């Protein structure tokens, strides 16, 4: 970082990510350039909220002026547009921290996702939240003059940058509290140096802002001619949207308010606005976004609702009102029961908080249930974005486990597609007569699941199997043990019994074959020793000679892989080797009198089974050697 200091004036270099963001924004967001005004007015509104909150404990911060608002003025001759607020303001350190750096975790990961394709970049930048930097879409230079509430006039700060990689910062004198942002407009931004253009944008984006947004207008005489006099005229309604009657709020207003609270560019999928009176008195406005934030799976991802108490802003990202598996929900909660001096620590162990959390959780789950029932296409859109996060729910929220399970979607053998469109309720509706379990299979990929040998008898008998191939699925099934009174059953576990779907003649024939093959099973056990837990015959296969399975209480293959990928110690998985006595290769093995040749057959069949189950084997050389010797003999 380069710095030059002249008295109190410094020239500093931007954090490298800021330079990249400025460049991308100017080129990617130009087609939607009016959003700069939404972002800057939104920031000014936040500054007023923060002042109100701090003034609760220190009223002197108002400095005799508690009428908060945002004012816009322009000067065509100077080519400038100024956005002013009398909110909390910033100190010198605040300015350096907020305007010279992007104080977000995972920024490097975010920038690695950007491409040269403007449409994709603009969407990603929108998810990232551009805030103050959006000013450079229309301005070739920006000046910020600010004084933090409570600081003397001579400790105000001026920040200036042309967005080229560095900025200057110096102390100035500023009598009024708050922030002035002066935009030196590019030629392409001059359209905003117009009263009617500003009115239009403010009405579009800022009607819901809870403080007045005014513009400086020219006073006209009785004949309608302009005079030299100017006045401030409030443009927005200045009533917090969530305090209004639902019937009076249009979809467009709800959508714009969502963009204000989330800094998202896209419209939300659905929302729920509720006023509750009774044991707890509160208003909630909850949104489900249409796109997942780029860092949703990042552990440092900020989530939660905006918290207001009696319409006074208290904090952003109040995570205590929404469980982690619903961390994608945006919006706010306004409570009349929490104290105005509430802190995050107090929220943690507060009965009101727990009650509001439970209510908000149920509200979101109900919203999702309605969407799934009434608009399958929209729900699929939601599932593609947030399905992985929702799968965390059964482990986290025992009380709502059944509701969450009903919202989960999977691939299945019923639908020849990797798309996860099958709900558990529809699976249960299609269950065969006499079927009392929900059968499922976990694998590394859809292709591996779809082609698994474990499916052969299920396909032959027309029994639907749910196919799971997300990394989280094996972990999920430790917590999701039943749905609608039906137990889940992994088809890769030993002891799987499909005999109820067999006729008596088949059962009798299998019994005879099993008896005949006892000696083959014993020879195989003797050869393998403790390399496997057991050797058994199986009749659940058709075109596959052998598989490996695990006991019900043994760790499954996918869970072992998940732990290994996370760097955890993984206990050895002991497999049960199941051979299909009706397969030609197994019959050839059984007919082999020579023990050495018999062993080669065992190696080949076990190796195949391990490859199909794990995608790898401990000793591929031994497997290949056995194949080569058998081929040579042929």
From Swiss-Prot:
The keyword Chaperone applies. The keyword Transport does not apply. Its main location: cytoplasm. It is found in: Cytoplasm. One of its GO terms (molecular function) is ATP-dependent protein folding chaperone. One of its GO terms (cellular component) is cytoplasm. Signal peptide: none annotated. PROSITE patterns: HSP90. Residues 1-344 are annotated as: A. Coiled coil: none annotated. Residues 345-561 are annotated as: B. Pfam families: HATPase_c_3 (PF13589), HSP90 (PF00183). Keywords: ATP-binding, Chaperone, Cytoplasm, Nucleotide-binding, Stress response. Residues 562-634 are annotated as: C. SMART domains: HATPase_c (SM00387). PANTHER family: HEAT SHOCK PROTEIN 90 FAMILY MEMBER (PTHR11528). Belongs to the heat shock protein 90 family. Molecular chaperone. Has ATPase activity. Homodimer. This is Chaperone protein HtpG.
């Amino acid at each position: 970082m380069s710095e030059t200091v002249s008295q109190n004036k410094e020239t500093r270099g931007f954090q490298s990510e800021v330079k990249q963001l400025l460049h991308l924004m100017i080129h990617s967001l130009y087609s939607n350039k009016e959003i700069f005004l939404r972002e800057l007015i939104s920031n000014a509104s936040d500054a007023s909220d923060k002042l109100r909150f701090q003034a609760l404990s220190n009223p002197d911060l108002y400095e005799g002026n508690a009428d908060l608002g945002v004012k816009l003025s322009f000067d065509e001759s100077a080519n400038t547009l100024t956005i002013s607020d009398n909110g909390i303001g910033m100190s010198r350190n605040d300015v350096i921290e907020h305007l010279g750096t992007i104080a977000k975790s995972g920024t490097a990961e975010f920038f690695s996702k950007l491409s040269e394709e403007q449409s994709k970049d603009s969407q990603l930048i929108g998810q990232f939240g551009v805030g103050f930097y959006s000013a450079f879409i229309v301005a070739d230079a920006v000046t910020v003059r600010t004084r933090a509430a409570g600081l003397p006039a001579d400790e105000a700060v001026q920040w200036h940058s042309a967005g080229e990689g560095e900025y200057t910062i110096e102390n100035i004198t500023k009598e009024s509290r708050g922030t002035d942002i002066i935009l030196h407009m590019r030629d392409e931004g001059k359209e905003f140096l117009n009263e009617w253009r500003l009115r239009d944008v403010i009405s579009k984006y800022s009607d819901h802002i809870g403080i007045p947004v005014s513009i400086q207008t020219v006073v006209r005489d009785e004949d309608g001619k302009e005079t030299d006099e100017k006045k401030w005229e409030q443009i927005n309604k200045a009533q917090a949207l969530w305090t209004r009657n639902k019937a009076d709020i249009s979809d467009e207003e709800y959508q714009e308010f969502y963009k204000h609270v989330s800094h998202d560019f896209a419209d939300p999928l659905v929302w729920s606005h509720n006023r509750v009176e009774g044991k707890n008195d509160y208003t909630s406005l909850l949104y489900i976004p249409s796109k997942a934030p780029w860092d949703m799976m990042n552990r440092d991802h900020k989530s939660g609702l905006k918290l207001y108490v009696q319409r006074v802003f208290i904090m952003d990202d109040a995570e205590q009102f929404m469980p982690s598996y619903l961390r994608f929900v945006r919006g706010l909660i306004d409570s009349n029961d929490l104290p105005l001096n509430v802190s995050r620590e107090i929220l943690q162990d507060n009965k009101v908080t727990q009650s509001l959390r439970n209510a908000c959780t149920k509200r979101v789950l109900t919203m999702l249930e309605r969407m799934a029932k009434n608009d399958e296409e929209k729900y699929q859109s939601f599932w593609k974005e947030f399905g992985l996060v929702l799968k965390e729910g059964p482990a986290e929220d025992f009380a709502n486990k059944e509701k969450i399970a009903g919202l989960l979607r999977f691939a299945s053998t019923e639908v020849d597609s990797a798309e996860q469109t099958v709900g558990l309720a529809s699976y249960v509706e299609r269950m065969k007569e006499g079927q009392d379990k929900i059968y499922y299979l976990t694998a590394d990929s859809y292709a591996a699941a779809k082609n698994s040998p474990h499916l052969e008898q299920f396909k032959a008998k027309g029994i639907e199997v749910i196919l799971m191939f997300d990394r989280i699925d094996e972990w999920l099934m430790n917590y999701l043990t039943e749905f609608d009174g039906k137990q889940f059953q992994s088809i890769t576990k030993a002891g799987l019994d499909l005999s109820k779907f067999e006729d008596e003649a088949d059962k009798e024939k299998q019994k005879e074959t099993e008896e005949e093959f006892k000696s083959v099973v014993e020879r195989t056990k003797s050869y393998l020793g403790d390399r496997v837990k057991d050797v058994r015959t199986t009749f659940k296969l058709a075109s596959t000679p052998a598989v490996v399975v695990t006991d019900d209480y043994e760790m499954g293959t996918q869970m072992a892989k998940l732990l290994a990928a996370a760097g955890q110690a993984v206990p050895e998985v002991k497999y049960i080797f199941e051979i299909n006595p009706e397969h030609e290769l197994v019959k050839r093995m059984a007919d082999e009198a020579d023990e050495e040749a018999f062993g080669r057959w065992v190696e080949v069949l076990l190796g195949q089974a391990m490859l199909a189950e794990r995608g790898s084997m401990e000793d591929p050389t031994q497997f290949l050697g056995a194949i080569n010797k058998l081929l040579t003999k042929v």
